[in-house]
């Protein structure tokens, strides 16, 4: 079964736009779970422009499905994850000023760094996923560094899906097969939506988890949050 983890960063962005606590991030997280989401994902950044570090502590107290924290493993983020001990940490090499994640790790160049970080998180009992491009060598590097899972960066797939979905999925099938052969779990995320999700799942049937935020929240503006989550779950179960 492929789990749907809802990324609630966009909810925090809306909240922070006006100050105060509307929408209530914690209530939205609980409602996502109540509506069928099988996980909650957040991606705090150093400037706290959407998710605040305090949000992570507050969410840890109430999330009853899988809690996944994404981010660049530096300084305050490392301390945050070690203190909270989420079910999963996803290591993402995003720059401080990046609008959103735009590339996976070079797991060969950063092998020693990742090995140390992953070891420390695993000693704390946290499952570790490494965000990678769909390149077999990068998947192999993540396995060598000790990762439990890889998260395949799906923006290139989403961009090419409508023009040539067979070509768009090819390298993901290969990367996923490599991950499976190495004993890694497989997650996927970035620009997945109601149009391209089912094709990804059908071609990688052993996919463990997808984390979806931006498109899901955009769809919720039209369909409502409960209906939207059910629509995404339906795409994963077709």
From Swiss-Prot:
Its EC number is 2.6.99.2. Gene3D superfamilies: Aldolase class I (3.20.20.70). Keywords: Cytoplasm, Pyridoxine biosynthesis, Transferase. It comes from the Bacteria. 1-deoxy-D-xylulose 5-phosphate binds at residues 45, 50, 100. 3-amino-2-oxopropyl phosphate binds at residues 7, 18, 191, 213-214. It is an enzyme of class 2 (transferase). GO terms for molecular function: pyridoxine 5'-phosphate synthase activity. One of its GO terms (biological process) is pyridoxine biosynthetic process. Pfam families: PdxJ. It is found in: Cytoplasm. SUPFAM superfamilies: Pyridoxine 5'-phosphate synthase (SSF63892). Pathway: Cofactor biosynthesis; pyridoxine 5'-phosphate biosynthesis; pyridoxine 5'-phosphate from D-erythrose 4-phosphate: step 5/5. The record marks 151 as: Transition state stabilizer. It catalyses: 3-amino-2-oxopropyl phosphate + 1-deoxy-D-xylulose 5-phosphate = pyridoxine 5'-phosphate + phosphate + 2 H2O + H(+). GO terms for cellular component: cytosol. CDD domains: PNPsynthase. The active site is at residues 43, 70, 190. Homooctamer; tetramer of dimers. HAMAP family: PdxJ. Catalyzes the complicated ring closure reaction between the two acyclic compounds 1-deoxy-D-xylulose-5-phosphate (DXP) and 3-amino-2-oxopropyl phosphate (1-amino-acetone-3-phosphate or AAP) to form pyridoxine 5'-phosphate (PNP) and inorganic phosphate. Belongs to the PNP synthase family. This is Pyridoxine 5'-phosphate synthase.
């Amino acid at each position: 079964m492929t789990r749907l983890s809802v990324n609630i960063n966009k909810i925090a962005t809306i909240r922070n736009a006006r100050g105060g606590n509307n929408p209530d991030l914690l209530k939205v997280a609980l409602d996502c779970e109540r509506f069928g989401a099988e996980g909650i994902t957040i991606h705090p950044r150093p400037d706290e422009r959407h998710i605040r570090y305090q949000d992570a502590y507050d969410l840890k107290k109430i999330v009853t499905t899988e809690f996944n924290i994404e981010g660049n493993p530096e300084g305050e983020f490392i301390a945050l994850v070690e203190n909270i001990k989420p079910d999963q940490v996803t290591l993402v090499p995003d720059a401080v000023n990046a609008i959103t994640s735009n590339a996976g790790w070079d797991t060969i160049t950063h092998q020693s760094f990742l090995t140390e970080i992953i070891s420390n998180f695993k000693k704390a009992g946290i499952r570790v996923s490494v965000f990678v491009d769909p390149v077999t060598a990068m998947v192999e590097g993540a396995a060598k560094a000790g990762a439990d899972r890889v998260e395949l960066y799906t923006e290139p797939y989403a961009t090419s899906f409508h023009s040539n979905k067979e070509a768009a999925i090819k390298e993901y099938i290969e990367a996923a097969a490599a991950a499976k052969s190495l004993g890694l779990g497989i997650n996927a995320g970035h620009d997945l939506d109601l149009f391209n999700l089912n094709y990804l799942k059908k071609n990688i049937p052993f996919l463990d988890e997808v984390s979806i935020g931006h498109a899901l929240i955009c769809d919720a503006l039209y369909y409502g949050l409960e209906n939207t989550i059910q629509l995404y779950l339906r795409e994963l179960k077709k």
